[in-house]
Amino acid sequence: MGKLEAAISPKTKLMLINTPHNPTGKVFTRAELECVADILRRHPHVIAVTDEVYEKLVFDGREHVRLASMPDMWERTITISSSGKTFSCTGWKVGWVYGAAHLVRAVTLANQWIVFCICTPAQRAIATILKEADEPYMGFPDYYAYVRSHYEKKRDDLAESLKLANIKPIVPEGGFFIMADTSKYEVPEKYVQQPGPTGESPVTRDWAFARWLTVEGGITPIPPSAFYQPETAHNAANLARFAYCKEEATLVEAKARFRKLGSSLH
């Protein structure tokens, strides 16, 4: 927390907080967010913008805590959420922002220059399902309990599949993705030298690994250096992000491919 506070200057306008976090799956605890709130209280010129699009997808009995719910934070927090993650319809770009009136007004004024038009049928559909999601569903007390259980199992299944390939999963506390350690593999040089998406060559190891695994293993991860600042991207060299928001048949096939990949190391 000391490094976080040290990064604040008189020119700082906002602090962006993402929980559950993408790509790591970290869910910030109440105690951790209280520390963040304390920092913000000491710097009244800074507002908080919280990305909480995975708020309903927290696992192992964890609690999703909203920074805006803490003392003195409502007036200083813009909360962002989304229907696409919660209801497994990521192509429906329908989300919402809420907070104190003066903050929402500023968002509204900016938004009119960002979004040309909206998809009213999708908005009406999401408004309806938000009401129905609190009702009992598939033997669970509500839809949210069902979807948590559903994705928690997918997470566990993919984590076990990764282990078959000697890829060490960093088991997420929430969200759609598993970050994993791929350092057991030596990536062929040709995948390092092939130009990257913007023509750069050589590419970073995580890009080369993602390419190699796609071509040779039939499995495509995301190279996580895309989530880093250039000066810290080296920390992602031995990492890859895998998604478990997939149909069961896809995860079963992936398991078979991971098993085959693991056997190649022996």
What are the residue ranges of the model-derived segments?
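PLP-dependent class I/II
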Residues: 1-266
